[in-house]
Amino acid sequence: MTITNINQLDPINGLYTYAEYLLWKFEERVELLKGKLFKMSAPSPAHQVVQSNLNIELGLYIRNQKCQIYPAPFDVRLPAKGEIGDAIHTVVQPDLCVVCDRTKIDSRGCIGAPDLVIEIISPGNSKKELKQKFKLYEEAGVREYWVIHPSEEYVIVNVLENNHYKTLSPIVDDEVHSVIFPTLKVHTKEIFRN
């Protein structure tokens, strides 16, 4: 059944799959975290500036790699063990993601872990959502996960080591160095340039 209004869904008790997600025809952007519905808040102007700056900086670097950068909205399906196709319960839309394995890309987005995920914090992001995404990306095998805080102008880099994230010290007014792309360096001044 096609859903045309988000109020037709049960955000508290509902457990949804990608097959159901594909039938939703309402304006609000949402994500599914292990089947649970999370409404995405509209990005702030600072969020949009950071996303645009990163798209430029990373785009210049990535175009010389065998990878591709994808900005939101772009569905990333993260199947849990045993989940396949439209039965997947986790669909996220990272602000930016980099995928080097082109076989993960299909006509609907990415299936499986991107190599790099970047989330830009907006006032509407809940701590619960951030904690769940950290765990989801870790479990899915996202090799590097950046969390960017525009209001305080710092970046946190999480690197997957032995299936667990190692969180590096917050980066303020300095270069952000990627571990998985050793020659990628972006200064926070370029990230937060307005």
Region annotations inferred by a language model:
Residues 1-194:
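Gly/Pro/Ser/Thr-rich low-complexity, intrinsically disordered segments predominantly at protein N-termini
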